[in-house]
């Protein structure tokens, strides 16, 4: 999925932040043919998932220099998918030590301390995701949000947006129902920005609220230029 209108997307924002902080990035060869495996796993396509797992782990083992570098992913649901693969990596003597980190956690720990925020938003509506919750990344998410905005608002009725990969595209009524209450809370006022950490969730929340949601790293990149 492409970035929200006027945005650059999470990957270019992450690369910009790394360059600004003096952190080198290595992109695996053939990355356009790699996947976290969630589309196969979530639909029960076991054989396809196993094939992709073997392909991804072999590629990342080479790209990380045998596990010397962390693998950073810029979409929370994909990080969760790779984290599931990590259990297989831990059981395999061929790929010991592969480490998967969500970009929000990596930026909070290794990038944010090296940056200077030069312009803040007045207010930001923030949507944590199911995957960021499972990964334990919500503290990092809120810390970055606080760095880019004077006020951070997570709706009291926050919960799953029910976009669930392609479910929100095929059955938009699921997202409409799941987000009704939190959308009302968000739309009770106007915010300077709307952020999350996963493109499909951003699409779901954009549909629910009528406001354009973008990845939190896009806001951080803009705030530190």
Residue ranges and their predicted role:
Residues 1-225:
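Iron-sulfur cluster-binding electron-transfer modules in prokaryotic oxidoreductases
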């Amino acid at each position: 999925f492409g970035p929200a209108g006027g945005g650059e997307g999470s990957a270019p924002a992450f690369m910009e932040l790394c360059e600004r902080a003096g952190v080198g990035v290595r992109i695996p060869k053939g990355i356009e043919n790699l996947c976290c495996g969630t589309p196969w796993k979530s639909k029960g396509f076991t054989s396809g998932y196993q094939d992709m797992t073997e392909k991804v782990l072999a590629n990342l083992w080479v790209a990380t220099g045998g596990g010397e570098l962390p693998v950073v992913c810029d979409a929370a649901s994909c990080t969760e998918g790779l984290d599931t693969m990590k259990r297989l990596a831990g059981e395999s003597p061929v790929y010991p030590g592969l480490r998967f980190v969500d970009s929000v956690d990596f930026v909070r720990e290794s990038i944010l301390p090296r940056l200077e925020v030069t312009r803040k938003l007045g207010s930001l509506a923030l949507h944590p995701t199911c995957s960021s919750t499972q990964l334990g990344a919500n503290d990092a998410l809120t810390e970055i949000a606080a760095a880019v905005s004077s006020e951070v608002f997570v709706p009291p009725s926050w919960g799953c947006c029910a976009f669930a990969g392609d479910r929100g595209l095929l059955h938009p009524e699921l997202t409409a129902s799941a987000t009704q209450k939190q959308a009302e809370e968000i739309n009770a006022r106007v915010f300077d920005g709307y952020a999350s950490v996963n493109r499909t969730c951003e699409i779901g929340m954009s549909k629910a609220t009528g406001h354009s949601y973008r990845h939190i790293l896009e806001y951080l990149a803009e705030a530190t230029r």
